[in-house]
Amino acid sequence: IVIMGWDLIYLILSFFKGWGADPNMYFNTNIVVGGNNLNGIFTPVVAVTAAVIFIWAVLWYISHKSVDGISKAVKFLIPVLFIMMGFIVIYALTLPGKMIGLTALFTPDWSALGNVEIWLAAFGQILFSLSMGQAIAVTYASYLPSKSKLIDNVLIVVASNSLFEIFTAVGVFSILGFMSLRTGLPIEQIATSGTGLLFVVFPEIFNIMGDVAYIIAPLFFLCVFFAGLSTIIAYLEPMSMA
């Protein structure tokens, strides 16, 4: 939820590129007080605190309506997420340098198959994205009719999840390829992982995109917000029904 709070702040900032010319400095001084260490862990950030409170209020409003409220929220969030991400991917594929990113995405490094950390990261991604072994699946399954085709449902969920992840990666790496072309830096150096990619690298990319970034950036951070909101709703459901 804290990361969603950061994203909500960046969603607002994206309308006027409020992170400034140095997104890394802005992130470490205004969002993560103390930088990437524990120096500022007990220093509250007013904007982040307000964003987290707002998100909890939205979650309460959705979840207190029980299954009906959650169902309506997800039926709205997921299709809108697909539409917005589709627009971003289509635009990303028009950017110069897109092939740099797509080549990096789809060119396999066979030597990595011998790296245990790669396998652990892959299994971790699968477990998290599919919610395997978690109470979410059990709770949602309890709402299904007794004659539901479990195997068919599993295949649909797995295929849909994997296809959307690949679809999203096409857009993300196309944009990273654009950044690589404009800056002259190798994509491996640009494509950091975690919050650095989301809150530092992408704002830097939006800074050099020009006026179109005032459309793409809000859509991007709104997609992240909707994805996070739908995920948290799923995690709250087992607790609310316990």
State what each model feature region is.
Residues 3-67, 99-120, 192-199:
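Inter-helical loop and helix-membrane interface segments of multi-pass membrane transporters/permeases
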Residues 65, 152-155, 241-242:
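Helix-loop boundary elements of multi-pass alpha-helical membrane proteins
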